[in-house]
């Protein structure tokens, strides 16, 4: 028997990511599922834990970690609520603004609580971001193409934005392409972050994919990561749940918990 299991609340348990995460937690010997947050009328399985409609109903729940796999419009409020009530948020929802992330980090320090916002929980995607940060030192001309299922609400993806932010730390911002470049269709060249172009693709059949394409005189370099199903995110989610128990402030990016 394993003592001191980490007690986890899952918000957004009815989504594809959420339902996969619930099964991972139920099967993990060191985790204990203690509550679910979502619409009760959507519950079709028999769960042995309480299901709540509103986060306020969880104020007195005994838990360690709040796993949030909801939607961009509620994830910030959920993470703040978790910290406010002594739970460590592990958030896989993307779409946070820089200001929202900064406010949550500040609040977590005040509460001395660990936490994690991860643009991507797939370990390969985290490595892709780190490899891109290294490559851009030598290939400063770069564009990002991110591809996701057509149910994804935010664009560009949090992974693409995080990748660009990391590369911007090593790359001088500059215009990429012809100086007199003109778009015959608005948006044809994609979004711009620090002079880097980001292109978003949304199609049925996809899960989560990203290419970082570097170009230089006479050569090119392409880095790519593919998540073929949502099981690819479970190792990172489990790692995040364990690691937030060991820190006293919220971290932005799973790389903070890897030996990179």
Swiss-Prot record:
Domain of life: Bacteria
Signal peptide boundaries: none
Keyword Endoplasmic reticulum (UniProt): no
Coiled-coil segments on the chain, per record: none
SUPFAM superfamilies in UniProt: Glyceraldehyde-3-phosphate dehydrogenase-like, C-terminal domain, NAD(P)-binding Rossmann-fold domains
Keyword NADP found: yes
Catalytic activity reported: (S)-2,3,4,5-tetrahydrodipicolinate + NAD(+) + H2O = (2S,4S)-4-hydroxy-2,3,4,5-tetrahydrodipicolinate + NADH + H(+); (S)-2,3,4,5-tetrahydrodipicolinate + NADP(+) + H2O = (2S,4S)-4-hydroxy-2,3,4,5-tetrahydrodipicolinate + NADPH + H(+)
Binding site for (S)-2,3,4,5-tetrahydrodipicolinate: 149, 158-159
Binding-site residues for NAD(+), renumbered to this chain: 12-17, 92-94, 118-121
Entry keyword set: Amino-acid biosynthesis, Cytoplasm, Diaminopimelate biosynthesis, Lysine biosynthesis, NAD, NADP, Oxidoreductase
Any Gene Ontology biological process: lysine biosynthetic process via diaminopimelate
Pfam families with a match to the protein in the record: DapB_C, DapB_N
Pathway given in the UniProt record: Amino-acid biosynthesis; L-lysine biosynthesis via DAP pathway; (S)-tetrahydrodipicolinate from L-aspartate: step 4/4
GO MF annotation: an example: NADP binding
Protein's cellular compartments: Cytoplasm
Enzyme Commission code(s) on record: 1.17.1.8
Family, per entry: Belongs to the DapB family.
Name of this chain's protein: 4-hydroxy-tetrahydrodipicolinate reductase
Gene that specifies this protein: dapB
């Amino acid at each position: 028997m394993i003592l001191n299991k980490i007690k986890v609340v899952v918000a957004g348990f009815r989504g594809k990511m959420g339902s996969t995460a619930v099964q991972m937690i139920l099967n993990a010997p060191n985790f204990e599922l203690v509550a679910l947050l979502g619409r009760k009328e959507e519950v079709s399985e028999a769960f042995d834990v309480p299901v709540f409609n509103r986060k306020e109903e969880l104020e007195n729940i005994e838990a360690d970690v709040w796993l949030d796999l909801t939607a961009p419009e509620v994830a910030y409020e959920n993470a703040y609520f978790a910290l406010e009530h002594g739970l460590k948020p592990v958030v896989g929802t993307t779409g946070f603004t820089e200001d929202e992330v900064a406010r949550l980090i500040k609040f977590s320090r005040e509460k001395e609580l660990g936490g994690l916002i991860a643009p991507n929980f797939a370990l390969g995607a985290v490595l892709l971001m780190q490899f891109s940060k290294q490559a851009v030192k030598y290939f400063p001309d770069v564009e990002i193409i991110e591809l996701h299922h057509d149910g994804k609400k935010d664009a560009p993806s949090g992974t693409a934005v995080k990748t660009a932010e990391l590369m911007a730390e090593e790359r001088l911002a500059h215009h990429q392409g012809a100086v007199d470049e003109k778009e015959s269709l608005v948006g044809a060249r994609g979004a711009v972050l620090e002079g880097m172009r980001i292109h978003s693709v949304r199609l049925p059949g996809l899960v989560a994919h990203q290419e970082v394409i570097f170009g230089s005189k006479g050569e090119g370099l392409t880095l790519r990561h593919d998540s073929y199903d949502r099981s690819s995110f479970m190792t990172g989610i489990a790692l995040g749940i364990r690691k937030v128990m060991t820190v006293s402030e919220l971290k932005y990016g799973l790389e903070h918990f890897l030996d990179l």
